Curated annotation (Swiss-Prot):
It comes from Neurospora crassa (strain ATCC 24698 / 74-OR23-1A / CBS 708.71 / DSM 1257 / FGSC 987). Belongs to the RRG9 family. GO terms for cellular component: mitochondrion; nucleus. Residues 47-144, 157-199 are annotated as: Disordered. This is Required for respiratory growth protein 9, mitochondrial. Residues 1-59 form a transit peptide. InterPro entries: NGRN/Rrg9 (IPR010487).
Length: 329
């Protein structure tokens, strides 16, 4: 080997294992192997070594050799741990010691004392009190003993069938009461708002949907009455409803009503319906529909920029709009 420190460590290990003393004269110094040094220097890269490290290595080797001669006859010991010594003194019993505990244990002691005192008091009370016997149920007793007990009380023993019938009737009454009571704070049946009740009522009243009443002019109302009065067999309610595009119920109400407006109310109605008709035929004129002579005299003219080609393309839409506005008259 090239270093004395390595040979010293190996020698100590072999001596401890085989209990054989190795003389120090067999130590081979690095100076005795010049060829080996040349080989190492050529193969390995060059490393600088400080003066302090070389001196420390030599001192370690000399100390190891001196220790061999002194400890040859002694018993082998375990190899020392190569740790750096600290300033604190070594304590061999540090594993057995435990950290100091807190001396103040008053809360735990108080809890334990209270628990022990309560258990002792309950045990004393249990010793003084007599154990309560379980009350025997009459239902478990035989029939003869039950008859005797009822006789002592001055009552007649009820029949088993009657008792079962009475019990079943009570259960049915409870079930009815639970069904009749309103369910409060039940997520499955939450409380309904007033508008929800109104919506359900409208659905029941108008299952096909809401159909608003058609507004008929005063002249149309008078014409319905006159036609039905002059030709009752020909102009029935069904024929009039198809002619004026209203429900038969509306025709019946018109024929049944006996209300007639006053002269002042009649004037107001005529003025209101005249304004309404004027607005409707203005919309028709914008679509290119030629209004009647009555409304043309009022200054309503069809749209001048309406082209003939567009009139053909929008013919179906015009017919639909005319039907819609006629329903409003």
């Amino acid at each position: 080997m090239s270093c004395s420190c390595n040979t010293a460590a190996l020698r100590i290990f072999v001596r401890n294992v085989a209990n054989i003393q190795v003389p120090s004269s067999q130590q081979v110094t690095p100076r005795a192997l010049p060829g080996f040094r040349r080989q190492m220097t050529t193969s390995l890269p060059f490393h600088t070594r400080s003066l302090h490290t070389t001196r420390a290595a030599r001192s370690d080797s000399t100390e190891a050799v001196s220790e061999e001669t002194s400890t040859a006859t002694e018993k082998p010991k375990a190899p020392k741990l190569l740790f750096r010594k600290t300033h604190a003194p070594a304590n061999p019993n540090w594993m057995g010691e435990q950290p100091p505990r807190r001396q103040d244990h008053k809360p735990r002691e108080l809890k334990k004392a209270r628990r022990d005192h309560g258990a002792h008091a309950s045990q004393e009370e249990g010793d003084h009190t007599e154990p309560t016997k379980k009350k025997n149920r009459w239902r478990d007793l035989p029939e003869e003993e039950r008859r005797e007990l009822y006789a002592k009380m001055g009552k007649e023993m009820p029949d088993e069938a009657e008792r079962q019938a009475r019990k079943q009737e009570q259960q049915q009454q409870k079930l009815r009461a639970s069904l009749e009571e309103p369910k409060k704070h039940n997520p499955a049946h939450p409380r309904r708002e007033s508008w929800q009740h109104q919506k359900n009522a409208l659905k029941e009243k108008f299952p096909e949907g809401w159909k608003p009443l058609k507004k008929l002019s005063p002249d149309a109302l008078e014409g319905i009455r006159a036609l039905h009065k002059q030709f009752p067999e020909e102009y029935t309610t069904e024929v009039l409803s198809n002619k004026f595009q209203v429900s038969p119920e509306a025709i019946r109400r018109i024929l049944k009503s006996k209300w007639r407006p006053d002269p002042e109310e009649e004037i107001e109605r005529q003025e209101r319906w005249f304004k309404r008709g004027k607005q409707i035929w203005q919309r028709y004129a914008e679509l290119g529909v030629k209004p009647p002579k009555k409304w043309r005299e009022q200054g309503i003219r069809p749209n001048k920029y309406w082209k003939e080609g567009e009139e053909k393309t929008f013919k179906d839409r015009q017919i639909a709009n005319v039907k819609l506005h006629r329903s409003l008259l």
